[in-house]
């Protein structure tokens, strides 16, 4: 067993604060403080370990390509504080195992991740990342980053029992540009998108400090993956998207997406075999925003409620070869005179359609618009 109750400060590159394998008990205790001052360093490294490695103290990485905790076939848990300062770093990075954050992860460098789960070995298997409970907060402060990131690599053998899961029941706050709350990429051609899944049961907020903080995504199913929102996504940055499914991915909204900033999109389906399905509520409050967008052969379906209060807002926008459907159970409410229920652009051919089988309601129920 390795327990740190004091201060560990490492000056060199490729340093490790606490290391253990096999049946090691690794613990940075409540009074423990690990600081890594050079690049490619790790606070706690657990390898092929049957025991869970725990951080109950403070871990700080000061340079690039570093991780607060790294588990290679070793489970990780953070119940206190992890901060990464420079690029290409991860708060918690796990391969073929499980990482659980229950408290604070702060990411200050670009191209980084709060929790990163990966499958790359030929054997496949399972990997998972969890941001668990109301005290769990992941904050992203620099571009090109993800609160939670999951990847299945093509090096995994075809036919293996392989699943990768990300779950958030806490808070993910994105305070930058070109970043995502939760992101998944499945590079294994034979692996079904249902096996690579991200679910939000908490709150994802894309929040802006300046107008340059734009083009963020709440949940990105980047390739052959599934994204599910079962709680709240707040889109408060310009030109940003609540949920995006591309490259044969699916995204499903089962609760609430709030679009507050201009030129936002609630749900976007892009590319062949990609779908976006709204099963609850999308609130379109930002100017020139759309509840759903289907483009380049993607399909968007509204099965419940899209409420457009925004000026020049659109319920379902269908672009080029996309397909958009307001189904028989779908309702688009337009509470602004300049709003449009379903808008089709460059959709001349018979194959690519915008269809309304449900209700489009004009004006507020009280007749004030």
Name the predicted role of every residue range.
Residues 1-41, 45-112, 116-179, 183-240, ...:
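Surface-exposed loop/turn motifs in large extracellular/passenger domains
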